[in-house]
Design a protein with these regions (language model features):
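Cytosolic, long alpha-helical scaffolding segments
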Residues: 1-113
Length: 113
């Protein structure tokens, strides 16, 4: 929320291409959330490969979008400060993925004991 408030305060706008990229990342985060919830509901949880895969997909998407971002900044496809806010949002979404895998790992650990 703070990142978007600062973006708006500085009058920066994400164009459609940036929003599409962020939506792609948010879709993966949503899938990771769904996996985490399913893992939490599973009383016999021993395998969290679904969560590992979800986290991997989030990380790979972030890596790919970050590489695209660098090229877009080099080509002046959008304002530098807009790009900073975009990367900040991507990083926050990736952190959510980290938190979700940690929760699945804790749920698995709980069921192993």
């Amino acid at each position: 929320g703070r990142i978007l408030k600062r973006k708006n305060a500085h009058g920066k706008v994400f164009d459609k291409s940036l929003l599409d990229r962020l939506n792609k990342m948010m879709d993966l985060v949503q899938k990771g959330f769904d996996v985490m919830v399913a893992n939490l509901k599973n009383p016999e949880l021993t395998d969290i490969s679904n969560a590992v895969n979800a986290e991997y997909n989030i990380d790979e998407c972030r890596r790919h979008l970050r590489e695209e971002h660098i090229v877009n900044i080099e080509n002046s496809n959008y304002n530098y400060l807009t790009g900073v806010y975009y990367i900040d949002v991507l990083n926050e979404l990736e952190k959510i993925g980290d938190f979700m895998i940690n929760i699945s790992q804790a749920a698995k650990s709980k069921h192993e004991n």
